[in-house]
Structure formats: C-alpha cells, structure tokens
C-alpha cells in the first residue's frame, strides 16, 4: 500500500459540460499512462473513480507517488479564465469524498494543486482548483 501524504484537489480546467470520455481523451493526448486524477466529480454530483488508489496518477508532478488526486469538472469561465464554478452537488460530493479519504489516510493533508507554490498568487503556476482548498477543508484536515 502506498503511503499517502497529500490529497490534492483539482479542477479539470474545462467547461462543466466536459464528459468522462473527453477527460480521458485529454489524458491520452498528454501521453499519460494513467489519468491525472483518482476521482472526478461531475456537476450533478456523480463521483467516478478513474484509477485505483494503489496506483499513481498524474496530478501534481513531483508529488504523485505519495498523493491522491481528486478533481471537479469545471474551473474556468466562458472566456477560459479561472473560476470556482462548482455546483452545490459537486461541493457536497467533494466534501464527503475528502472526509472518506481523510479517514482512510489520517496523516494526509488536503490542499489545492496551486498550494504547492505557496499562498501568494504571484507564485502560482496554475490557479487549480480555483478556490482555497486548505481553507475550505480545514475542518477535515484538523479532525484527526
């Protein structure tokens, strides 16, 4: 079993109508053997597991071997700018998923992809997941 130190939250950086097949095609276009996320949450709240947690996904370069990566579909506006456009169903499913993952991996820290570059947005190479995941999920991070 892999030692999980981090649970990264992502957005797909696509529109909210992005399909599962379109997402899989994107990973193939990038030449990845495995998907970028272990789990993805669609606007209706549907949760899909793309990869077993015992396998390494391609979520955050340099951190993947000790991380679980979860994403919501969306994260940009119609002009392609970063936007937290999660639906309430996505928020609810993400919260429940992160609670479950934290219980399974109590030492893991939940954070957003962008947080590997610190809290100052001038240092971010990406805005993903387009909201402050550490702040939003601090109660889960602090529960165990």
Regions found by a protein language model. Give the residues of each.
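Basic/polar, cationic surfaces and motifs that engage anionic cell-wall
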Residues: 1-8, 12, 66, 75-144
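Short, conserved "active-site rim" segments that organize catalytic pockets and cofactor/ligand binding
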Residues: 1-55, 129-132
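Short, flexible loop/turn motifs enriched in small residues
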Residues: 33, 63-65
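Short amphipathic alpha-helices and their capping/turn segments at secondary-structure boundaries
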Residues: 54-61, 99
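Ligand-binding face of N-terminal immunoglobulin V-set domains in extracellular IgSF glycoproteins
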Residues: 70
């Amino acid at each position: 079993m892999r030692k999980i130190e981090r649970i990264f939250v992502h957005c797909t950086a696509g529109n909210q109508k992005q399909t599962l097949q379109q997402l899989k095609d994107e990973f193939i276009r990038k030449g990845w053997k495995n998907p970028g996320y272990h789990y993805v949450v669609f606007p209706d709240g549907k949760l899909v597991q793309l990869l077993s947690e015992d396998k390494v996904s391609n979520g955050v370069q340099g951190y993947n071997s000790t991380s679980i990566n979860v994403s919501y579909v969306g994260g940009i506006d119609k002009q392609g700018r970063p936007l937290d456009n999660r639906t309430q169903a996505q928020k609810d499913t993400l919260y429940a998923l992160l609670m479950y993952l934290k219980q399974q991996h109590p030492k893991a820290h939940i954070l957003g992809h962008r947080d590997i570059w610190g809290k100052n947005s001038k240092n971010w190479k990406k805005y993903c997941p387009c909201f402050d995941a550490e702040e939003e999920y601090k109660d889960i991070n602090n529960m165990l």
